């Protein structure tokens, strides 16, 4: 577990320095317009801290999944190596400039930006073009990542990482630069992520409930295995619940089920029992014959799902039980929705869990942490995200932490003495 306390931007001397900040500006862009700027706004406190202290910022990010060119490729006459219109960070520079209320310089080639960096004075901001326009950024070969890192590191004096969402990947800009510069500091967003996950994994207020949903048991095996040694209650929802229920001998109709994981489900339930973890599975379901929204889906009377029906959300009795468990806990970690929340008729379970967590946090001081990805989207959609202690910005990164893995992009940062 790489969650030792890290030196943060507050420990770094930034006055008069050029500060390289790896941010996460991987925002949704449609026809050149940013449709959600949450990630840009999330990075502002770290950027503003550097500017206030008299430093300048050199910002690096990826956007989307461009194919990426090689550093050795010849430069095209009128364009940039690896350039893809759909993945340019140019619209982000414009939006960031509005949010900061100052000009943000834009370097159209992240590996040919030395002249831009050289001109920076205290209080200036420079955004480099998409680092993933170069294949070396996330290359499997360390020497290729390091070659790119050396070019980027030469632009600045201090390295700050504020991109928790990509901390589970070894890359030129997440792990390469701090190795070249010999130190790395956590930005405010990264610090918050590390602190909340360290608390829930190492020393949570108890009782602690893990709420785990989503489609497949196979996606969450390591998470369940690791968390069973740390939690008091395990609440299971989403399609993965039906694999557990079939393993217990219940009828699941035509609900999604991983037939080859039934023995695994049994062994996880046995392990929970041995560790005194109370496991809660749905006792009723919201069903339909087809995977589509309907005005009046079937609600089962009990745990059994009738033949020809698939369960697509947890039922009202289950919601009540899950709400009661959340109400008696002091910490919650939630990863994975309870049903097909994108369809309103199957969103009640997911939104009820979000509401119970939001209420508990605001009224009873519950520590509520939401893993990123779908769960964060569901919390946003329910209107409860603002009421949680912490909504993680990293889907893959938060999942790997909950699985007990260390994150390369966190491990590489300088430890607090």
UniProtKB/Swiss-Prot annotation:
(2R)-3-phosphoglycerate binds at residues 23-26, 39, 61-62, 64-65, 132, 168-169, 216. The gene is PGKB. Its EC number is 2.7.2.3. It comes from Crithidia fasciculata. Pathway: Carbohydrate degradation; glycolysis; pyruvate from D-glyceraldehyde 3-phosphate: step 2/5. SUPFAM superfamilies: Phosphoglycerate kinase. This is Phosphoglycerate kinase, cytosolic. ADP binds at residues 214-215, 220, 238, 311, 335, 341-342, 374-375. It is found in: Cytoplasm.
């Amino acid at each position: 577990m790489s969650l030792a306390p890290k030196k943060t931007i507050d420990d770094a001397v930034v006055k008069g320095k050029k500060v390289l900040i790896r941010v996460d500006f991987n925002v949704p862009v449609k026809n050149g317009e940013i449709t959600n700027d949450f990630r840009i706004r999330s990075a502002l406190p770290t950027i503003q801290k550097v500017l206030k202290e008299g430093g300048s910022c050199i910002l690096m990010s990826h956007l989307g999944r461009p194919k990426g060119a090689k550093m050795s490729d010849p430069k095209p006459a009128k364009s940039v190596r690896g350039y893809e219109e759909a993945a340019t960070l140019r619209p982000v520079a414009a939006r960031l400039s509005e949010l900061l209320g100052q000009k943000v310089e834009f370097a159209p080639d992240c590996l040919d930006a030395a002249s831009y960096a050289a001109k920076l004075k205290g209080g200036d901001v420079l955004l480099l073009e998409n680092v993933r326009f170069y294949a070396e950024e996330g290359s499997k070969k360390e020497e290729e990542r390091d070659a790119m890192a050396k070019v980027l590191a030469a632009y600045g004096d201090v390295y700050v990482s504020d991109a928790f969402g990509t901390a589970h990947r070894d890359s030129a800009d997440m792990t390469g630069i701090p190795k070249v510069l010999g130190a790395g500091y956590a930005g405010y967003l990264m610090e918050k992520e590390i602190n909340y996950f360290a608390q829930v994994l190492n020393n949570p207020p108890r009782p602690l409930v893990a709420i785990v949903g989503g489609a497949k048991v196979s996606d969450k095996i390591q998470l369940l295995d690791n968390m069973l040694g740390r939690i008091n209650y395990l609440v299971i929802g989403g399609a993965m619940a039906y694999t557990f229920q079939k393993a217990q001998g219940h009828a699941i109709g035509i609900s999604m089920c991983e037939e080859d994981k039934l023995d695994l489900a049994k062994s996880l339930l046995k392990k929970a029992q041995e560790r005194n973890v109370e496991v809660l599975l749905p006792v009723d379901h919201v069903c339909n014959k087809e995977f589509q929204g309907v005005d009046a889906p079937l609600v089962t009377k009990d745990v059994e799902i009738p033949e020809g029906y698939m369960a697509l959300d947890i039922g009202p009795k289950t919601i009540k039980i899950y709400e009661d468990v959340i109400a008696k806990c002091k910490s919650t970690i939630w990863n994975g929705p309870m049903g097909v929340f994108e369809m309103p008729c199957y969103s009640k379970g997911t939104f009820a869990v979000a509401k119970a967590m939001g209420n508990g946090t605001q009224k009873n001081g519950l520590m509520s942490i939401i893993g990123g990805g779908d769960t964060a989207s569901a919390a946003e959609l329910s209107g409860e995200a603002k009421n949680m202690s912490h909504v993680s910005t990293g889907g893959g990164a938060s999942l790997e932490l909950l699985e007990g893995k260390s994150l390369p992009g966190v491990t590489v940062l300088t430890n607090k003495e």
